[in-house]
């Protein structure tokens, strides 16, 4: 029952306390969902989400399966996201329908769709957490190519961790690109775990 972390959003007036047990359950079930979509050790995922608990679930689920993930800042325009899609060739993009800042809404899913169209590489899956925010609800009936994050998590079985070498790539972090195109810096699992 110990609290793992507290999600506190003054913009949406939401406070959520997540225990270590809840975190482990959500992460292992979401990992099972990713496995059911065909993802496995050595694959790559892009996580393009606001700072919500589901982003942490996605990152940890990828790590649990040996899927190298790249978290892309939600403030980036579709063109910047497309550059990262082409560079790391993800099998899946994990996103949210929208994000909120103090005085504006960030349309994550429309940005992902635009980046998808721009990119030469086409990820096999787009998993969307529907935040059900004003004007940015997901039209699941008319967009069958999208996978519902919450349904995937709820219907999936928990899976165990996949063993990886200490040198296995954990995540890719892109440089700012001040002197040209952003470059992906790969952090390995062992180095990150011991840092």
Q: Which sequence ranges carry the predicted segments?
A:
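Conserved S/T- and glycine-rich ATP-binding loop of Class I adenylate-forming
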Residues: 45, 62, 169, 175-178
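Conserved AMP-binding/adenylate-forming core of the ANL superfamily
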Residues: 4-59, 145-151, 190
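Short, intrinsically disordered, charge-balanced linker/junction segments flanking boundaries
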Residues: 188-195
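Solvent-exposed alpha-helix faces
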Residues: 28-32, 86, 180
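Structural core segment of the AMP-binding/adenylate-forming
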Residues: 64-151
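Conserved pre-ATP/AMP-binding loop-to-beta segment of ANL
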Residues: 3, 126-129, 140-174, 181, ...
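N-lobe entry segment of adenylate-forming
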Residues: 1-18, 25, 29, 116, ...
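Short acidic loop-to-helix transition motifs that present clustered carboxylates
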Residues: 54-55, 75-80, 193
């Amino acid at each position: 029952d110990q609290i793992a972390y507290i999600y506190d959003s003054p913009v949406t007036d939401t406070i959520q306390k997540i225990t270590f047990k809840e975190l482990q359950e959500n992460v292992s079930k979401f990992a099972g969902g990713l496995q059911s979509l065909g993802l496995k050790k050595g694959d790559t995922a892009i996580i393009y989400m606001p700072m919500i608990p589901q982003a942490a679930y996605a990152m940890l689920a990828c790590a649990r399966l040996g899927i190298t993930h790249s978290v892309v800042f939600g403030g980036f325009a579709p063109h910047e996201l497309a550059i990262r899609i082409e560079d790391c060739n993800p099998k899946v993009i994990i996103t949210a329908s929208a994000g909120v800042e103090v005085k504006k809404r960030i349309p994550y899913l429309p940005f992902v769709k635009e980046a998808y169209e721009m990119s030469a590489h086409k990820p096999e899956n787009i998993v969307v957490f529907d935040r059900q925010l004003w004007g940015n609800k997901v039209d699941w009936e008319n967009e069958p190519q999208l996978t519902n994050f919450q349904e995937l998590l709820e219907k999936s079985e928990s899976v165990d961790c996949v063993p990886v070498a200490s040198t296995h790539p954990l995540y890719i972090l892109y440089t700012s690109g001040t002197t040209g195109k952003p470059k992906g810096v790969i952090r390995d699992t062992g180095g990150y775990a011991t840092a």
